[in-house]
Regions:
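Acidic, Ser/Pro/Thr-rich low-complexity regulatory regions
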Residues: 1-112
Length: 112
């Protein structure tokens, strides 16, 4: 079934991989937090900066994807690309048409 430029298999693969991508993305965030907390800045700066980062990061699709539906899948993928949660090699397994759309977005549109 073709729907909005992707197949049912693409939708199923997206739902399977999303938790894996989110876990990997959050592992990266935790490493960034650890590096920041190990820095030589005052404790109060660490506390307030970390609170600010956590508040911002928890809104990202790489942490919490809201509105997961077929009609939002492309937008969620674009968010994940823009956040750096996924890259080109994560497009493997998707249908050729959908993969081409993702590669075009990755190469030409994403926020760098």
């Amino acid at each position: 079934m073709q729907n909005l430029g992707f197949t049912e298999a693409d939708w199923k693969l997206f739902r399977k991989r999303l938790p894996e991508w989110q876990e990997r993305y959050m592992e990266g965030l935790v490493e960034e937090y650890k590096a920041f907390l190990s820095s030589e800045v005052p404790a109060s700066t660490k506390f307030w900066e970390l609170e600010k980062r956590l508040k911002n990061d928890r809104r990202k699709t790489g942490v919490l994807a809201e509105g997961i539906s077929r009609s939002n899948m492309k937008f969620l993928m674009m968010d994940l690309i823009n956040e750096g949660a996924i890259a080109e090699d994560d497009f493997d397994g998707f249908s050729d048409d959908f993969r081409d759309q993702l590669l075009f977005y990755y190469a030409n549109v994403r926020k760098k």
